[in-house]
Amino acid sequence: MGSTRIPLVKALHSPVSDYVNYDIIVRHYNYTGKLKISADKDNGIKLISVVFILICCFIILENIFVLLTIWKTKKFHRPMYYFIGNLALSDLLAGVAYTANLLLSGATTYKLTPAQWFLREGSMFVALSASVFSLLAIAIERYITMLKMKLHNGSNRFRSFLLISACWVISLILGGLPIMGWNCISTLPSCSTVLPLYHKHYILFCTTVFTLLLLSIVILYCRIYSLVRTRSRRLTFRKNISKASRSSEKSLALLKTVIIVLGVFIACWAPLFILLLLDVGCKVKTCDILFRTEYFLVLAVLNSGTNPIIYTLSNKEMRRAFVRIMSCCKCPSRDSASKFTRPIIAGMEFSRSKSDNSSHPQKDDGDNPETIMSSGNVNSSS
């Protein structure tokens, strides 16, 4: 009984001295076979790394402009835009973290202490986790809004900050678990090949969490589409042909947008999920694909580059503001300032009548068919 407990305790509670022992990095990389791979390829910074760094620089600049657009435009200081700003911040940090990861890779890896290595890899986990959790938070917010059929108010502001705070707290905990003890410093046979100081059980845990997040996002967006289709059928049943036709067009546009959102997300993240599952299942030095991690990871990072396009630039009002920021124009045009749009997902916005501004409760769905998600601009029905 005691003999089986000791390795478990060591795996969860590594001595403090292990975190500053330079030999541990070399030992673990040698055990997994990555030391030989690195030695064979180590001729300075690789061309592919330069390409990846340039991609990260684009992602960083792209998301900086999104944050500047939201900050400089007062009409965007609203709960839904907080989610978009939070997504841009996490994507920006993902670009920064991956750039730092690339610069500290290769021969530099063996000059790091385990504590520094955990910080290098953990920062990537935190940034990418925050990005995925932000996508989930946006989906939750849109679903709740669709259920209530109400636009944002004070209570929604509190809910927004609560969801955003939860994104970062959970991401920090998830990324910090290895440095807090869930690692394989003392148990080499349990080590991951992709991340040689990470325990395979931790890799499996993270993959499971991200897969559940993906499924949750898919379910929420499918539910949103279902709600829109239900309201469209109600209008058809009431023989309100013109409004039903408009609603059907919006439903089709919504379906296309949902396919884009989920398709891009799955295309970027699924390969990395599969690689990590292989890492958990494969024995050490048996799966050559595990030594090509950078190509799978850069796909996940690319999702941070597509998010601003899907969630921000597809909104016409934000696109105008974005262009103004890029052109260093300090005075927004009156024409664009007179309109106001509320992004939902990937260019989907609310359309509403003046009655939405009142304090009266929302009427039957059929009386306000414009209060649904669309793919166009917001046009007041008055």
UniProtKB/Swiss-Prot annotation:
N6-acetyllysine carried by residues:
10
Q: Where is the composition biased (Basic and acidic residues)?
A: 351-366
Q: How is it modified after translation?
A: S1P-induced endothelial cell migration requires the PKB/AKT1-mediated phosphorylation of the third intracellular loop at the Thr-236 residue.
Query: Which domain of life does this protein belong to?
Result: Eukaryota
| Residue ranges crossing the lipid bilayer per the database entry | 47-68, 83-104, 117-138, 161-182, 197-224, 258-278, 290-310
Compositional bias, Polar residues, is annotated for 371-382
Q: How does it assemble?
A: Interacts with GNAI1 and GNAI3. Interacts with CD69; this interaction promotes S1PR1 degradation.
User: What is the recorded name of this protein?
Assistant: Sphingosine 1-phosphate receptor 1
